[in-house]
Amino acid sequence: MTRYCAATRCKNRGGQAAVIQRKVSFYPFPLHDRGRLQEWLRNMKQYKLYPTKHQVLCSDHFTADSFNIRWGIQYLKPNAIPTLFSFTEKIQDIAELELTIKEGTQDGVKVDTDTVPSQDFCPNVTNNLSHGFDTDEYVDPDDKQVYLKNTIDGITVSQNKTKDLYVPNSEYEIQPHLITPSKFRQTSVENMIVSSVADLNSQSNQVYFELQTDQNYVAENVDTFQVDHFSDVQKETFPLSLVKQTKQMDAEKDSVITIIVPGGQDGSAISDNLQFTSSEKLGFENDANSTNEILESEHSYCRQITDRHYLRQKIAKLQSKIAVLEAQENATLSRLRLLESVIAKLKQENLLSDEKLKILENCGSSVDIVIV
């Protein structure tokens, strides 16, 4: 694995041709010596760094008296401490940062010098953000206007002056208007979109439900609206829950609910085309039964294709084999019993022969005594 120097602003790494020519070597941190490790980190100005056994420092950060050369190999002394570190680039970065802060103040943007800017300033663009509705229609003129102001830490609220909100890396500007939730009512559900429709002549205690299709808009003056079923683009049928108006809404001019129905069909054709017939129900039941049969045939040990007569013959053969094995087992058991009886008889005969030998020896000794 390639070794990299853990010091900041140091670009030495193992395997470089320049490193090989200069004979730069790498040494691990003294993890076993805590005091020496703290001195290393203090000289590196890395107080929060806790190195691992894989992190190393190159020989450029040590003085010449920190090494012992034996047999042409450069060894680091056990008490060596790195002292050669360069922090000039960091000072240059700070100078560049101060220069950018001064340039920002010259352009008319005030920047706090104590904090580091993390956003890029963009020019003032007069394009409005569009969210699918006009904000002026939903702003209450009686409410107090709240304005947004851009700072370096975030967005602050101001009630005295009007400031432009600068969005980093964007082409839009948010105008100083605030949408109040008291006048804006919008209902959004899956497959249902609520939008605003301008120039409506509504009466009191009436609600306009607009059925929006891909081609036209149909507005109806009704108290309740019911949708039984609807179909999607692929002509697949599935039920939809009933949408009912259970209570009368406030008599306001902007209370409009728009429902988008896919497929480009009228409201009357929605419920007529989507009634399940008995044949369709039977078709669904047959499909379910066929799937169950397929699962049974796949996961059963006996396939449905085989015949019962063949299975009975196979069972009879297995039973005959079992009977033969039982007979062989009985025969082997009888043979074992016979062998046990023979062994017992031989043991008895052996005992008898031993007794006969002893008797003969006694007789022979008695005859010898008589002869003497």
UniProtKB/Swiss-Prot annotation:
Q: Where in the cell is it found?
A: Nucleus
Molecular function terms, GO-annotated: DNA binding; zinc ion binding
Regions annotated as coiled coil: 306-362
Q: Which SMART domains match?
A: DM3, THAP
- Asked if the keyword DNA-binding belongs to this entry, the reply reads yes
Keyword annotations of the record: Coiled coil, DNA-binding, Metal-binding, Nucleus, Zinc, Zinc-finger
Q: Zinc finger spans (THAP-type)?
A: 1-85
- Entries under InterPro entries matching the protein: THAP_domain_protein, THAP_Znf
The answer to whether the entry has keyword ATP-binding is no
- Known Pfam families for this protein? THAP
What cellular component GO annotations does this protein have? nucleus
What domain of life does the native source organism fall in? Answer: Eukaryota
Q: What is its main location?
A: nucleus
Name of this protein: THAP domain-containing protein 5
Taxonomy of origin reads: Eukaryota, Metazoa, Chordata, Craniata, Vertebrata
Q: Which gene encodes it?
A: thap5
